[in-house]
């Protein structure tokens, strides 16, 4: 068992780049962990068809930093609701990337089934939205407003009860 903890595996990104990493680091991904269990120690490279090299390297960087963390369980829901947007300092710095990379990391974390990374990415986006008006959110994420002024007024009236007063 100790030998597999330090053994290396190879991942192949969507753009064909092979990256060799420690098995323990790769197993932060439930998808990769399950693939390794299914393949055994065949030594074959594991294809990651939905993630390109630059994003995969960022995900691996996060996994290396968090390789010693306990695996997440379904029991942490109560704790995660309490601290909905708390992110530790290292993760905050890690997530200081351009928006495109941030969303690619979130998509990769979802695909690779790395719940803790997915949570950090989503909390980062939540913090970007927190306290902003719809107009500010549209500007932040370059979203075009497709409502007519009349539709906007109607939506505001229908949701007036939810406004902070």
Curated annotation (Swiss-Prot):
Gene3D superfamilies: Potassium Channel Kv1.1, Chain A
Pathway(s) it belongs to: Protein modification; protein ubiquitination
Keyword terms, alphabetized: Ubl conjugation pathway
Name the UniProt record assigns to this protein: E3 ubiquitin ligase complex SCF subunit sconC
Pfam families according to UniProt: Skp1, Skp1_POZ
Organism: Arthroderma otae (strain ATCC MYA-4605 / CBS 113480)
Cellular component, GO annotation: CBF3 complex; kinetochore; nuclear SCF ubiquitin ligase complex; RAVE complex; single-stranded DNA-dependent ATP-dependent DNA helicase complex
Gene that specifies this protein: sconC
Taxonomy, superkingdom: Eukaryota
């Amino acid at each position: 068992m100790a030998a597999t903890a330090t053994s290396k595996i190879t991942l192949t990104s969507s753009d064909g780049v092979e990256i060799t990493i420690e098995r323990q680091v790769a197993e932060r991904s439930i998808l990769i962990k399950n693939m390794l269990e299914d393949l055994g120690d065949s030594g074959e490279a594991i294809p990651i068809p939905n993630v390109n090299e630059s994003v995969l390297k960022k995900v691996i960087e996060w996994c290396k930093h968090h390789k010693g963390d306990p695996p997440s369980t379904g029991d942490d829901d109560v704790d995660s609701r309490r601290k909905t947007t708390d992110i530790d300092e290292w993760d905050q710095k890690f997530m200081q990337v351009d928006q495109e990379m941030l969303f690619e990391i979130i998509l990769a974390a979802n695909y690779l089934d790395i719940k803790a990374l997915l949570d950090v990415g989503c909390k980062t986006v939540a913090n970007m939205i927190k306290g902003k008006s719809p107009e500010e959110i549209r500007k932040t994420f370059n979203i075009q407003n497709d409502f007519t002024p009349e539709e906007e007024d109607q939506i505001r009236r229908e949701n007036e009860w939810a406004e902070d007063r």
